[in-house]
Regions:
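Short helix/turn-capping signatures at newly exposed starts of structured segments
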Residues: 1-107, 114-119, 123-142
Length: 142
């Protein structure tokens, strides 16, 4: 699921204006919430809110998805978050090779850069795993 979503995002015809992103989001299986740049989608741990930010030209810059978030919050769930992070990193490593950035600390993260001039960053927080997709318009802020 993680790799398939990233591949679909990479293949989109960037730049895309945020105010024109609704139809693209719906093709990805996401639903508009009525708030510009906020969508909902179903992932491994259920329905999550997706946030898209824009640049000065109103093009989508970064798509942020809490890709894995357990329903409950406890010690056991912390382990699930870590396991999910490790599994997603392993899947990415298998398909795209070694990330260009690996940080192991309280909020560990890895990042891959692609020839299409996009960056995918996967971050493990205490309660969830976040997927941040930097479009060619957003890569400048990375």
């Amino acid at each position: 699921e993680f790799v398939a979503l990233v591949e679909r995002l990479i293949g989109l015809p960037w730049p895309i204006r945020l105010d024109q992103f609704d139809s693209t989001a719906q093709q990805l299986g996401w639903s508009p919430t009525g708030d510009t740049g906020i969508f909902t989608g179903n992932f491994a741990s259920g329905e999550q809110r997706i946030m898209c930010t824009k640049d000065k030209s109103k093009n989508v810059r970064v798509i942020s998805i809490p890709f894995f978030r357990p329903e409950r919050e406890g010690f056991e769930e912390f382990g699930l978050v870590n396991d999910a992070f490790v599994a997603y990193v392993a899947a990415g490593f298998e398909v795209w090779g070694k990330p260009f950035q690996i940080v192991i600390d309280r909020y560990s993260h890895v990042a891959w850069k692609y020839p299409q001039n996009v960056i995918v960053e996967l971050t493990r927080y205490e309660r969830f795993v976040d997927l941040s997709f930097y479009t060619p318009q957003g890569i400048r802020v990375y």
